[in-house]
């Protein structure tokens, strides 16, 4: 007996036992009713007929059994009344305006132990504009379950949703049947013999009738041996006519061919027939068009199997011309020729790179924006082309050409056993899905609109985990793990045998302001609402469609202020909704409002308006969303967070007059799972496509709406996160997941004109019992998968937010962990991710569509693929931001930068004004298929990065604890031009636009009061020629400004301003350990007097304690001396600098920004003379206070050999050429060092070291004396000419070398800029090859030239975008 048979037997046995119990024990009636409610003998058959004016009241103990379809005005079940639906073969449709169940009333269709097996539909009808007075609580078109009411809907047990287990390709080509394709190397006549009963290939063979006449004889013998009735598929690949004899030609003619008799050289020819039935033949033939022209002969024929199913045989014999785009060519001149650019001119400029007759031309701006092109023809050939930018001739642009390759042969045989149908291979047993059921397959690309619906067909040959569906997929739907990430498409069941649906009009009508401006369809559907005190609510196996209204409170399923609905509320069994499909809804899917403990399990929400799974006011807790699927979630009009940009701008009735909408800030937040309280459980859920976000945890500082007062302010921001594991998010625009932001909990006013519940700022910091004075309790996110989200895989702001064993792939930005722009909101907390995988560009390339604007090259193979945002968008794995962050034991895979697209595994937030913590730690990182040049990118001015001149852009830094990123354990990686953290031994990484340094680092947080438009200049005393300019993080409309540079400890600094110095200033010591110090000189106008004190500020308790004062000293040395409560400042009025030593006095926790006692601050009040000028003391400060640059913390040794985990690695290159002064003598000093091995120079002139760019080995080193450089420079030219391509060439001068003359042109050949002028000292890293790497560097100065940098090995040219 099969599984289904056993289930039927057990079900019948249970019913038999129930009836025996009823017969022997009459008191057991209630037990039977609970098992199969329609079998109770108390029920009275009821058939009210069809009367739209009939107001039905079922009460006073009436128990009715609805046995047939009916139409009534309304139904009210109360006072112990009960309506039960008869379970039999005849479908029952109950059509009514509304159903109200309260005061002991009950409605039953099936039960948990006896699921309803027939078909039952409730249709809620009516328009909003009929003049009918809506119920003040329930409205119109509803099923209302009030106090004492019970609603029990229990449909058939069916699998709710599962995963695709085999990839579906567009058109279904790879889903069953047979596919055969050959090109070169498979010449001749190809024959397939096909069984007409099943469509399977019985045998196939190849006959090389080009090579030998014996092959013709063998072909005839083969065809004669095939029994009549078999299907023959015959075609030529490449060439088959040269030794094709008459016997073979006649044999094919006998089978029904008309063209084989005259087959010529390389003619494409295809033929299908049934042996013994020449009239069944189909045939195609075409002559060969030469090596530059495509030609194809194609046939197909439909056959029917013995089971009545159809299969299609397709056959093609072709000469195919493949095409490819050339590289991009930069063009920076406006055409001076009338009629456009001559293509011949480009041929000359780029010989061998452009074909003679391009098929197509593309042009873009230098930033990648598409431009219009026009091809002008002359005598049938491409003669000129013109480029236009908004109607004008382009000035500076890039152009490329589509060129055809020589043709190649191609033979294809396809047998499609699923004609206009597709077999789905699924993870689970889906035998509960029946013919006629509707399924939806989720998108596995960036666009959620690639979700597709299919109808199940009968399939006798399907396995238990297979179904046949009508039609073919339009899009690629992944059904496998790709690059370590489970990207399988979700497949949801939409059909159920119990249906609750709204009756809809054909088009939109204006029952609410603006509604028809946004929707062209009727959105006034039905809804189900549960009120406080309902008796029971259990819904399963039910389909809800056309439900919800664009009115607040009218949702498909709505638990409204119901309180505790589980055991805590006295419900046994606890309330649940499970195994539901809620689709094509007009306002959400499931709303939990002021209700706790609800189980929402195995629910599919599809094609909804507004947040799908929605918690409303903030106090909703302990609800569990288990194995729920939401997809195709679109914007709605109800709340600002539901609205898209158009709605946000048009719907302003709930705002204060004068409000100017900012859609991306105030609105644009529609989400599949909208969690207004973190203390809810999300397990095994999938957010498979929303206009904005998959999972969004949002915070209500105080409860809103009717829930006002249910918790104290700030409770939701501190409550620990419920269970969150095994969830997945993809095909969303903004993010797969967000923990951040709040909603505005006050009405619109003159002070804040934004509408109630607009999106605002909020911070999450989970603590035990939601008490910030109790220990922190981290929010744990485990086994989360985020892929194909256009912007972010996840944006998570904390507090302690920790991720473990997560997977991110194909997101614009995989993950951003944020804390606070100035401080972590919860000081001492951290954000962490460990044991996780990030994939930049996976094997899921998506589907190219005609209107897909974001398609372009990518991945390791540079093939076409869908892209997240723009062709040149800098894809990033983890975006470092704020801090402190810990990244541990993570793997990065397939991040490959292109020339024009700065893809990287690790990077920083773009256009960042905020702080960057030097204690952002990275350890245990592994890279797979990530070139070492693409591991990190600090940014550069250009598209997406803009000018890279915001404060956070300039101060980016992180700690490479074990060297797994940089190969330098314990190093700090920083932007290459941040001289506040650099020292003389830092090593540049040009590919990253960064530097590898060592040291002890912290931050200063400087607040300048009563001003917001000052630009601050800070200088480290040992590098006075390299200031750092900070604009301030805040807008110019604030009453103060703040600056937060990362600084090297135990160093001296000066601070200057572009206007008069601020009269009030506070300096906070951030990330200082006890005893850490810096010395600061602040520029003020002469005549200024000061009042300076120190204090400790406890941000949590908002308490400040004064700890001391600074008194003036006339001796600079005394600044170094301090005593408890008393320190010194030195006012050097000549230079205009106020000197202070800032030293931390208290211990600090590991991840805290401030000490355990609070934040240590120094406050300065300055009485500044009126009309004082600009406070920039640089000219008087230096060289007076210049300090010698020293390395306090030695650079770590680079990892080598077996310590490295990847084949590519960095080669360390150090070069110095300088004059060193010893007493009264000057000594010339020069050397080249490669990976720790020095090559000193002994003679004046040029030293040269050549390195193999593939292996990183030094292959030669020599020197050229001045006499050679000056007299016989061709020796150097000849030497360079013999250097193999792909070689790194290092050069350093020594002594008074010849810095001018013909020999310097060698530098240009090795990548130096043309027209260079050398000074007295020179160091150069060059490259001999066909391209110029970014790391080619020339340093030339009068006294010292120095290059410390790394070069990637092997040297590989980046592919162009």
From Swiss-Prot:
Catalytic activity, as annotated: Random hydrolysis of (1->4)-linkages between N-acetyl-beta-D-glucosamine and D-glucuronate residues in hyaluronate
What high-level taxonomic lineage is stated for the organism?
Eukaryota, Metazoa, Chordata, Craniata, Vertebrata
| This protein's GO CC annotations | clathrin-coated endocytic vesicle; clathrin-coated pit; clathrin-coated vesicle membrane; cytoplasm; endoplasmic reticulum; extracellular region; fibrillar center; nuclear membrane
Q: How is its activity regulated?
A: Activity is up-regulated by histamine.
Region forming the signal peptide: 1-30
Residues glycosylated per entry: 119, 165, 312, 370, 420, 889, 921
Q: How does it assemble?
A: Interacts with EPHA2 and ITPR3. Interacts with HSPA5/BIP; the interaction induces calcium leakage from the endoplasmic reticulum and cell migration. Interacts with clathrin heavy chain/CLTC.
Q: Where this protein primarily resides, as one coarse class? A: nucleus
Whereabouts are the PbH1 repeats? 572-594, 595-617, 719-741, 798-819
Coiled-coil region list: none
Q: Tell me its EC number(s), please.
A: 3.2.1.35
Q: Which residues form the G8 domain?
A: 44-166
Necessary for its endoplasmic reticulum (ER) retention and interaction with HSPA5: annotated span: 295-591
Please identify the protein, giving its name as recorded. Cell migration-inducing and hyaluronan-binding protein
Q: Where's it found, cell-wise?
A: Nucleus; Cytoplasm; Endoplasmic reticulum; Cell membrane
Q: Which UniProt keywords apply?
A: Cell membrane, Coated pit, Cytoplasm, Endoplasmic reticulum, Glycoprotein, Glycosidase, Hyaluronic acid, Hydrolase, Lectin, Membrane, Nucleus, Repeat, Secreted, Signal
Q: Name one GO molecular function term.
A: hyaluronic acid binding
Expression by tissue, per the entry, reads: Expressed in dermal and in synovial fibroblasts. Strongly expressed in gastric cancers compared with the paired normal tissues. Strongly expressed in both ductal carcinoma and invasive breast cancer cells compared with benign epithelial cells (at protein level). Strongly expressed in brain, placenta, prostate, breast, lung and testis. Expressed in fibroblasts, epithelial cells and cancer cells. In ear, it is specifically expressed in inner ear. Expressed in cochlea and vestibule tissues. Strongly expressed in gastric cancers compared with the paired normal tissues.
A single BP term in Gene Ontology = positive regulation of peptidyl-threonine phosphorylation
Q: Which organism is it from?
A: Homo sapiens
The similarity comment for this entry is: Belongs to the CEMIP family.
């Amino acid at each position: 007996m099969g599984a289904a048979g056993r289930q039927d037997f057990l079900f019948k046995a249970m019913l038999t036992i129930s009836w025996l119990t009823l017969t022997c024990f009459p008191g057991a009636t209630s037990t039977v009713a609970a098992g199969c409610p329609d079998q109770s003998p108390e029920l009275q058959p009821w058939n009210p007929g069809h009367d739209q004016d009939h107001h039905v009241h079922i009460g006073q103990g009436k128990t009715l059994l609805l046995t047939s379809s009916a139409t009534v005005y309304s139904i009210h079940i109360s006072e112990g009344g009960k309506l039960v639906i008869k379970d039999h073969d005849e479908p029952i449709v109950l059509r009514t305006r509304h159903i109200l169940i309260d005061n002991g009333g009950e409605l039953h269709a099936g039960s948990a132990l006896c699921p309803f097996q027939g078909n039952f539909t409730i249709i809620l009808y009516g328009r909003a504009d009929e003049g009918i007075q809506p119920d003040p609580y329930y409205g119109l078109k509803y099923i209302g379950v009030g106090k004492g009411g019970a609603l029990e809907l229990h449909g058939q047990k069916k699998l709710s949703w599962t995963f695709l287990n085999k990839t579906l390709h567009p058109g279904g080509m790879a889903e069953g049947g047979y596919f055969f394709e050959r090109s070169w190397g498979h010449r001749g006549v190809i024959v397939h013999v096909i069984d007409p009963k099943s469509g399977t290939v019985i045998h196939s063979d190849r006959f090389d009738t080009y090579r030998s006449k014996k092959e013709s004889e063998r072909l005839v013998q083969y065809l004669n041996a095939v029994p009549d009735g078999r299907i023959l598929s015959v075609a030529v690949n490449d060439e088959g006519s040269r030794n094709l004899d008459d016997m073979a030609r006649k044999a094919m003619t006998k089978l029904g061919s008309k063209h084989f008799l005259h087959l010529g050289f390389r003619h494409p020819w295809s033929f299908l027939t049934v042996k013994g039935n020449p009239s069944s033949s189909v045939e195609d033939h075409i002559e060969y068009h030469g090596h530059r022209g495509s030609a194809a002969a194609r046939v197909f024929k439909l056959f029917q199997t013995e089971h009545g199913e159809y299969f299609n045989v397709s056959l093609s014999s072709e000469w195919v011309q493949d095409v490819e785009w050339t590289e991009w060519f930069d063009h920076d001149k406006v055409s001076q020729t009338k009629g456009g650019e001559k293509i011949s001119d480009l041929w000359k400029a780029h010989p061998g790179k452009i074909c003679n007759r391009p098929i197509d031309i593309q042009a873009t701006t230098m930033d990648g924006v598409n431009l219009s092109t026009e091809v002008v023809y002359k005598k049938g050939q491409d003669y000129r082309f013109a480029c236009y930018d908004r109607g004008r001739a382009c000035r500076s642009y890039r152009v490329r050409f589509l060129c055809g390759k020589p043709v190649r042969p191609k033979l294809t045989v396809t047998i499609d056993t699923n004609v206009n149908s597709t077999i789905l291979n699924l993870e689970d047993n889906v035998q509960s899905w029946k013919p006629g059921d509707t399924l939806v397959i989720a998108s596995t690309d960036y666009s959620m609109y690639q979700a597709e619906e299919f109808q199940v067909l009968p399939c006798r040959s399907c396995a238990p985990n297979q179904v046949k569906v009508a039609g073919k997929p339009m899009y690629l739907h992944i059904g496998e793990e790709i690059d370590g990430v489970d990207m399988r498409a979700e497949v949801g069941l939409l059909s159920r045998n119990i249906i609750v649906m709204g009756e809809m009009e054909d088009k939109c009508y204006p029952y609410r302001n603006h509604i028809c401006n946004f929707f062209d369809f009727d959105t006034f559907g039905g809804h189900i609402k549960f009120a406080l005190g309902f008796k029971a609510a259990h819904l399963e196996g039910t389909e809800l469609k056309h439900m919800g209204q664009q009115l607040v409170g009218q949702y498909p399923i709505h638990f409204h202020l119901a309180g505790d609905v589980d055991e805590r509320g006295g419900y046994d069994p606890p309330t649940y909704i499970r195994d539901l499909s809620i689709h094509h809804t007009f306002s959400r899917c499931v709303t939990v409002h002021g209700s706790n403990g609800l189980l929402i399990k195995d629910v599919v929400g599809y094609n909804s308006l507004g947040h799908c799974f929605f918690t409303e006011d903030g106090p909703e807790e302990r609800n569990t969303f288990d194995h729920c699927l939401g997809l195709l979630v679109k914007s709605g009009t109800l709340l600002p967070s539901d609205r898209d940009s158009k709605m946000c701008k048009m719907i302003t009735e709930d705002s204060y007059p004068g409000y100017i909408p900012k859609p991306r800030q105030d609105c644009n937040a529609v989400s599949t799972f909208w969690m207004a309280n973190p203390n809810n459980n999300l397990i095994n859920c999938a957010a498979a496509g929303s206009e904005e976000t998959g999972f969004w945890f949002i915070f209500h500082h105080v409860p809103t709406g009717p829930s006002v007062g249910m918790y104290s302010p700030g409770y939701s921001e501190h409550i620990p996160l419920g269970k969150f594991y095994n969830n997945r998010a993809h095909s969303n625009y903004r993010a797969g997941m967000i923990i951040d932001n709040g909603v505005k909990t006050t009405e619109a006013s003159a002070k804040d004109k934004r509408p109630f519940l607009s999106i605002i700022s909020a911070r999450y910091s989970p603590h035990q019992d939601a008490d910030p004075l109790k220990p922190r309790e981290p929010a744990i996110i485990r086994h989360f998968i985020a892929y194909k989200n256009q912007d972010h895989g996840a944006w998570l702001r904390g507090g302690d937010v920790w991720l473990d064993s997560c997977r991110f792939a194909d997101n614009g930005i995989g993950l951003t962990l944020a804390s606070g722009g100035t401080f972590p909101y919860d000081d001492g907390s951290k954000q962490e991710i460990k044991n996780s995988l990030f994939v930049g560009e996976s094997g899921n390339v998506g589907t190219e569509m005609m209107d897909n604007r974001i398609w372009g090259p990518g991945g390791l193979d540079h093939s076409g693929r869908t892209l997240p945002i723009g062709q040149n968008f800098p894809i990033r794995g983890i975006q470092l931001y704020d801090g402190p962050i810990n990244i541990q034991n993570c793997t990065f895979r397939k991040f490959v930068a292109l020339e024009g697209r700065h893809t990287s595994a690790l990077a920083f937030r773009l256009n960042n004004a905020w702080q960057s913590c030097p204690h952002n730690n990275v350890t245990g990182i592994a890279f797979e298929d990530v070139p070492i040049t693409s591991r990190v990118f600090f940014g550069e001015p250009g598209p997406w990065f803009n000018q890279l001149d915001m404060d956070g852009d300039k101060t980016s830094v992180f700690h490479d604890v074990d060297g797994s990123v940089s190969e330098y354990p314990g190093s700090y990686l920083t932007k290459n031009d941040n001289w506040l953290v650099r020292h003389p031994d830092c090593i540049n990484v040009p590919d990253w636009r960064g530097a590898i340094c060592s040291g002890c680092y912290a931050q200063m947080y400087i607040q300048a009061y009563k001003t917001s438009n000052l630009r601050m200049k800070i200088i480290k005393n040992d590098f006075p020629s390299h200031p750092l300019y900070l604009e301030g993080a805040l807008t110019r409309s604030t009453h103060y400004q703040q600056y937060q540079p990362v600084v090297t400890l135990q160093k001296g600094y000066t601070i200057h301003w572009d206007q008069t110095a601020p009269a009030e200033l506070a300096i906070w010591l951030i990330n200082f350990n006890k005893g850490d110090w810096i010395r600061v000189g602040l520029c003020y106008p002469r005549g200024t007097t000061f009042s300076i004190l120190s204090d400790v500020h406890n941000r949590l308790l908002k308490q400040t304690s004064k700890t001391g004062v600074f008194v003036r000293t006339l001796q600079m040395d005394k600044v170094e001396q301090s005593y408890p409560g008393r320190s010194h400042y030195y006012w050097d009025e000549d230079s205009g600098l106020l000197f202070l030593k800032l030293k931390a006095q208290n211990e600090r926790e590991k991840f805290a920004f401030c000490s355990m006692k609070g934040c240590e601050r120094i406050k300065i009040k300055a009485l500044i003379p009126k009309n004082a000028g600009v406070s920039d003391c640089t000219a008087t400060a230096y060289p007076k206070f210049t300090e010698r640059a020293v390395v306090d913390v030695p650079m770590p040794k680079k990892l080598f050999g077996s310590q490295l985990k990847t084949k590519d690695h960095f080669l360390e290159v150090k070069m110095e050429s300088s004059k060193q002064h010893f007493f009264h003598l000057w000594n010339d000093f020069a050397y080249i060092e490669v990976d720790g091995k020095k090559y000193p120079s002994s003679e004046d002139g040029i030293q040269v070291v050549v390195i193999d760019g593939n292996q990183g080995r030094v292959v030669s080193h020599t020197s050229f004396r001045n006499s050679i450089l000056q007299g016989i420079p061709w020796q150097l030219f000849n030497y360079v000419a013999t250097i193999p391509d792909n070689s790194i060439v290092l050069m350093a001068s020594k002594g008074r070398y010849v810095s001018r003359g013909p020999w310097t042109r060698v530098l240009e050949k090795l990548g130096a800029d043309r027209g260079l002028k050398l000074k007295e000292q020179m160091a150069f890293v060059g490259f001999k090859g066909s391209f110029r790497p970014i790391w080619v560097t020339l340093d030339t100065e009068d006294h010292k030239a120095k290059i410390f940098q790394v070069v990637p090995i092997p040297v590989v040219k980046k592919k162009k975008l």
